[in-house]
């Protein structure tokens, strides 16, 4: 009985040993496979870093920036109307606020009347000049008659038909006529001098002065309307109706949201291979990773962020600790991307720059054009001047 039981036990022991060996073999194979997979993954990661990732610089310290165009009046006054509020979209030239214009309207009407008077005065001076010219012609005719009378009497005096007294009277008449001609010529010269010479009505000094006053009054009246200096969205409105404002005081701001960029603050160690013109990809926290903006490096700041702070760092001390500095890098965005997915100033962005692309260390092209104030259109007041000059024509 004992020998019969021992044989099954030996067989079971052999089976257990076989299973254990198989398990150990499988475990070694798994470890080998895992080790090989890890090595391949590390090699792939190293290759990817060498081929792609080492040519990318990324930062999350980036924010949307743009121009905040201040709206200020060009003259002081009391605010009568405020036509736009925060978040309103406006176009360049739109009226944003209106100042009280009662005094300016009166000044404008007074200037128009002064121009009318200047034109009429010029007409009177023209008439006086014409009258002085007629007097010169009349006096010259009197002189010619006196000279003819003197010649006749002189011829008769030789035969004794005319007395010496009559001949003396004739000579006196000629002298008086000559003096009258000289006086008339002087009066004509004075009238022409007062007229300003042979120039057109518009070019007369008095008329030019009156036109200048009229344009000045019209400009002051026009400046009671505070207009938008650029296309954009109204922000930071602080002006209220009835408020007394001075020239240059900020009333509100206009932000051109179509012209925004990103200021990305890269570490100084990340700028080694970064150049102007290199492409960039940007992601906004507002829209998430599914929306990618295209852009390019436009320029580097002239100094680090701390260099332009109100209180620059003072490193000339014994307990100095080196801190990696960050340099603001401007990234311009593709206009089409911004139009499809508008951004707001101050939004957070994640920026990746492809440093393997070609670029220039220094910008050789001028930057984007800055907003300009709307130039004054003088056509309206010029038409008014033309109407006044035409109505005053003889």
From Swiss-Prot:
Example of a GO biological process term: transmembrane transport
Membrane topology, record value: Single-pass membrane protein
Domain of life: Bacteria
Keyword entries, A-Z: Cell inner membrane, Cell membrane, Membrane, Transmembrane, Transmembrane helix, Transport
GO terms under cellular component: plasma membrane
SUPFAM superfamilies: HlyD-like secretion proteins
UniProt-annotated stretches for the region Disordered: 1-23, 356-376
Subcellular location(s) of the protein: Cell inner membrane
Main location group: membrane
Induction: Expression is positively regulated by MtrR. MtrR acts by modulating the expression of the regulatory protein FarR, which directly controls the expression of the farAB operon.
Transmembrane segments: 33-53
Keyword Transmembrane helix: yes
Family affiliation: Belongs to the membrane fusion protein (MFP) (TC 8.A.1) family.
Subunit organization: Probably part of a tripartite efflux system FarAB-MtrE, which is composed of an inner membrane transporter, FarB, a periplasmic membrane fusion protein, FarA, and an outer membrane component, MtrE.
PANTHER family assigned: MEMBRANE FUSION SUBUNIT OF EMRAB-TOLC MULTIDRUG EFFLUX PUMP, MULTIDRUG EXPORT PROTEIN EMRA-RELATED
Function: Mediates resistance to long-chained antibacterial fatty acids (FAs). Function is dependent on the MtrE outer membrane protein.
Protein name: Fatty acid resistance protein FarA
Gene: farA
